[in-house]
Amino acid sequence: MRYLPLTEADRRAMLDVIGAKSVDDLFRDVPPSARLAGPLPLPSHQGEMEVERAFTRMAGKNLSAGCAPFFIGAGVYRHHVPAAVDQLLLRGEFLTAYTPYQPEVSQGTLQMLFEFQSQVATITGMDVANASMYDGATACAEAAIMACRITKRNRVIVSGGVHPHYAETLETSLRFTEMEADVLPPDPLGMEDMIGRVDSKTACVVVQNPGFFGTVRDLRPLAALCHEAGALLVVMVAEPTSLGLIESPGAMGADIVVCEGQSLGMGLNFGGPGLGLFATRDKYVRQMPGRLVGQTADVDGRRGWVLTLSTREQHIRREKATSNICTNSGLCALAFSIHLTMLGGTGFGRLAELNHLAATRLEQKLRAVKGLRVLPQSYYNEFAVHLGDDADAAAVVDALADKGILAGVPASRFYPTWPELKPVLILAATETNTEDDMDRLVAGLQEVL
């Protein structure tokens, strides 16, 4: 296929249609400081060996998660991923992100997605799940939009315990619609009260459990409050391994459950890729976005799998589709499914226990640090700590990084305009953390505080 570039007349005609004066107008939302004004300053051409050495030197400046005590979480978590997961992903029949439109030649992929859906529905306590979304943030936004369609209301209340990136993505998705997001202030103590906020105009309440600051809460009272007002409860789960220990959102009354699936099957990859999980009640299935794989039988009575309820989707009814998300995170869904299958039900529960035990052990050790206090009263594998009124959590993190310790995420990174959160540090502990890791963190905190 030949590449035919646009002429200046072509560009001018396209810009006129959208009302832009120049190509630069298309990038006006990008801050000038982030734009490249001239050619990229690359060195002269080099051989493969020289380039490899240069990149190796650059990589040597990084402090790898596997080479240091690692307590960073805040939405992405370090877990052990069995080597078999990546090996199975490399099989030719799976190594694609393409949607299997032709069931007669895609039974393996369709069966995998069907089993993935079944696993997601089981761990979330819901009736039905789709074949994945892009990531947890987009799944959260799509859930809010779905709730507005179902209730025919426009107001979305977002708990202060929801990850700020999820809240920002939700706000972006609603910005040019009639829907509005009411994002509550950050809630490090898990004490916010929804009474008086949920009313007849509320489409849904979006809450994260465990929360961004680590709080685990009983969602039943909130579910009852929402349902009494005719609103839906959307539950976001950023750490899906918690579902092996905490009662499922479905059992606590959630109407829609969305998750970030990165913890199972995927490692830490500079922020991606992620995996969005999306589950709901049977009665809302026709309003659910994303692909849906169903089980059927062919003319000979043999069991098979097909894409079902496809009239909800943009490739069938573009202008009336529930979402524009289509081909998305199928390979990541397979990684999630393989990892969860290898664990099994008992192993999944045991993994969750190990994570909670690691966090509990870390909390006990942190009691030796003068002036430090743990904020959540209940948590899973992550909690926020207050380092003292005069402490700067960001400076503490930098000081410990210089000592070879990756000591969590300062809350001020996400809330720079909230001075009361400057001393707050978010720490995560998983099955990968050792006693020595925890002792080094405690010793480091005692030294720098």
Curated annotation (Swiss-Prot):
It catalyses: N(6)-[(R)-lipoyl]-L-lysyl-[glycine-cleavage complex H protein] + glycine + H(+) = N(6)-[(R)-S(8)-aminomethyldihydrolipoyl]-L-lysyl-[glycine-cleavage complex H protein] + CO2. InterPro entries: GcvPA, GDC-P_N, GDC_P, PyrdxlP-dep_Trfase, PyrdxlP-dep_Trfase_major, PyrdxlP-dep_Trfase_small. Keywords: Oxidoreductase. Pfam families: GDC-P. One of its GO terms (biological process) is glycine decarboxylation via glycine cleavage system. GO terms for molecular function: glycine dehydrogenase (decarboxylating) activity. Its EC number is 1.4.4.2. The glycine cleavage system catalyzes the degradation of glycine. The P protein binds the alpha-amino group of glycine through its pyridoxal phosphate cofactor; CO(2) is released and the remaining methylamine moiety is then transferred to the lipoamide cofactor of the H protein. NCBIfam families: PRK00451.1. Belongs to the GcvP family. N-terminal subunit subfamily. The glycine cleavage system is composed of four proteins: P, T, L and H. In this organism, the P 'protein' is a heterodimer of two subunits. This is Probable glycine dehydrogenase (decarboxylating) subunit 1. It comes from Paramagnetospirillum magneticum (strain ATCC 700264 / AMB-1) (Magnetospirillum magneticum).
